[in-house]
Structures are given as C-alpha cells and as structure tokens.
C-alpha cells in the first residue's frame, strides 16, 4: 500500500491510506541506511514501512516533506518583530523553491514596523485579535494544498488555527484535532482541512541555517533572479566590486532594501 505520513512519534509512523490510518514501524534496512521518513512523505508499507517515495522538497526544521506552501507566522509584537528572523525563514524556504505565505499577527499591538517591502513582495496577510474579519480571508489559502505552519513560540499559530476552523463549517476545531489546548504542540502533525492538509509544528526560539554561503547567495527568490546578472557565477554579493555585482547595484538604487541586504550579510556570516 502507498500512503502519506501524518505523524511520527516514538519510532512509530501514522500513515493515512484511502481514508484509513495505520500505525507501523520502519523496517530495519531504512533505519540502517539512516533514511528517516518525515511528516508529508509518501511511503510504501504493509505491516512495516518499507520505502520512501521520491520527495519533491524537504525542510530540515521543521522536518517535513512534499509541501505546497510554507506559511510563516510572525508577530509584530510580543514577541517583538524581527526582519532578520523573517529573512532567515525566507532564505531557508525559498532555497527549496517552496511557495511562501506570510501572516503577520498582533497587528493591533504594533503599527510602527515598516513591513511594506514584505507586503509588496510576498503574499501577505495582517491579522489582529480585535478584528475577526482579518482571519476570514485566511481560509482560501489552505484550500487543496499541503501547508506547513512555521514560526516562533507565542506568535499566534494556535489562534490562527482556531479562527480558520471556526470560519470553515466543513471541519471541527483544528486545535482539538491537533491535540492543542492551552499548551503548545510538541510534535509535527498533519491534519486534513479544506480539501488539503495543514502541518502544525512546534514553535522555537532559534533556528539555524544549514546551507553553504554559495547556496545562501541564491536563497532568496529575488537574489536568485537578480544574481544571474552578476559578473561572477558564484558571486556572494559581499566583497565584490559594485560594477561586478548586480545585487549591490540594486541595493544602491534601493530596489533591494538596505535592511534586507544587511540581513543577508549577517546570515552569510552565520554560515561561514
């Protein structure tokens, strides 16, 4: 049988196949080869999980595969907004050529942050606890897609899940389906929603980039596009001369914001 992994817990894999769930272990050969199935994987199984089908993409943290879009949930306050953290998320996700959606939460608590660049460049939404309508427009982004929610602890992922489930009469309360109450989720788990799937992930206080400087230089979609006009194929957009680096030229002309370029340089230093 072929099914999709919905949850991994204590060495067991919860697999959905033809509207039924099965809990199995992986065969020893997979473990010996250090091939670890993750949530979102399509797998072959009978009494045991025997094979992982080829993946179209994979994220390391959160560890998920075969997703259609990553929804970055980031707070404008409590925790304080950080363009550096957002750009770190974006570099990791866009490097995998995964579509990005950004949901800015707690917009009512902070109206001072300049997020215009992100609103203009990415599919983005602003939500406020005191504005129910700000959540209603989120329903359609999940339709017929496998979506993964990523973000720090405390940014409001649970609120979003509860709000969209209340706005969609086809589903039960999502947080109940995910086993979420007052406490944050501790495992990566997929559920069916709006003719697609949502993967909820644990929040975290820090995230590391696991790529080379060369990969990072092309990780942002815009950098990947514009770096093709740099003089050198492996331009890092750092110490090269202005006339040789198209990214630097676009920063100078303000087409790429200076704060984003500085975030990139900081990320570049992190992956040395």
UniProtKB/Swiss-Prot annotation:
It comes from the Bacteria. Its EC number is 3.6.1.-. GO terms for cellular component: cytoplasm. Zn(2+) binds at residues 230, 235, 237, 245. GO terms for molecular function: GTP binding; GTPase activity; metal ion binding; rRNA binding. Residues 56-207 form the CP-type G domain. Its cofactor is Zn(2+). This is Small ribosomal subunit biogenesis GTPase RsgA. It comes from Mycoplasmopsis pulmonis (strain UAB CTIP) (Mycoplasma pulmonis).
């Amino acid at each position: 049988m072929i099914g999709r992994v919905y949850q991994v817990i204590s060495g067991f894999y919860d697999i959905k196949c033809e509207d039924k769930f099965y809990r199995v272990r992986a065969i020893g050969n997979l473990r010996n080869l250090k091939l670890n199935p993750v949530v979102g994987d399509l797998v072959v199984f009978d009494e045991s999980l025997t094979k992982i089908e080829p993946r179209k993409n994979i994220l390391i943290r959160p560890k998920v595969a075969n997703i259609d879009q990553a929804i970055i949930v980031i707070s404008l306050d409590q925790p304080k907004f950080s363009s550096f953290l957002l750009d770190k998320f974006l570099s990791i996700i866009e490097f995998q050529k995964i579509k990005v959606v950004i949901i800015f939460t707690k917009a009512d608590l902070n109206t001072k942050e300049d997020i215009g660049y992100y609103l203009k460049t990415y599919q983005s939404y602003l939500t406020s606890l005191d504005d129910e309508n700000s959540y209603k427009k989120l329903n359609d982004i999940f339709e017929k897609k496998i979506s993964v929610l990523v973000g720090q602890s405390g940014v409001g992922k649970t609120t979003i899940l509860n709000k969209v489930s209340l706005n969609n009469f086809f589903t039960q309360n999502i947080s109940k389906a995910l086993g979420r109450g007052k406490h944050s989720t501790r495992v990566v788990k997929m559920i069916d929603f709006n003719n697609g799937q949502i993967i909820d992930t644990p929040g975290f206080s820090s995230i590391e980039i696991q790529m080379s400087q060369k990969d990072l230089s092309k990780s942002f979609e815009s950098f990947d596009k514009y770096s093709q006009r740099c003089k050198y194929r492996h331009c890092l957009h750092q110490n090269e001369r202005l006339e040789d680096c198209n990214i630097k030229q676009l920063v100078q002309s303000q087409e790429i914001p200076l704060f984003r370029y500085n975030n990139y340089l900081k990320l570049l230093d992190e992956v040395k």
